[in-house]
Amino acid sequence: MPKSRTCSFCGGSIEPGTGLMYVLRNGQILWFCSSKCYKNFVKLRRKPDKLEWVRKVKKSLLD
């Protein structure tokens, strides 16, 4: 059975067979649920705690 993964940026769940895997130079693997999360984290270097939409996603996951 495929593993369920969580997004490294927003914390959302990633369905098996979808998402984006990004490997850092130190060997750490980051998983992203969408290109929006990938671009915000890797290219724009934004912190997830400072974005309102990320807080809403994390709050909805906890409820």
Curated annotation (Swiss-Prot):
Gene3D superfamilies in the cross-refs: Ribosomal protein L24e
Keyword RNA-binding tagged: yes
GO molecular function, one term: zinc ion binding
Cofactor note text: Binds 1 zinc ion per subunit.
GO cellular component, one term: ribonucleoprotein complex
Binding site for Zn(2+): C7, C10, C33, C37
Cofactor: Zn(2+)
Domain of life per record: Archaea
An individual GO BP term: translation
Keyword terms, alphabetized: Metal-binding, Ribonucleoprotein, Ribosomal protein, RNA-binding, rRNA-binding, Zinc, Zinc-finger
Zn finger intervals (C4-type): 7-37
Subunit annotation: Part of the 50S ribosomal subunit. Forms a cluster with proteins L3 and L14.
Cited NCBIfam families: PRK14891.1-1 (NF034186)
Its biological purpose: Binds to the 23S rRNA.
Family indicated by similarity: Belongs to the eukaryotic ribosomal protein eL24 family.
Stated name of the protein: Large ribosomal subunit protein eL24
Organism: Aeropyrum pernix (strain ATCC 700893 / DSM 11879 / JCM 9820 / NBRC 100138 / K1)
Classification lineage: Archaea, Thermoproteota, Thermoprotei, Desulfurococcales, Desulfurococcaceae
Gene: rpl24e
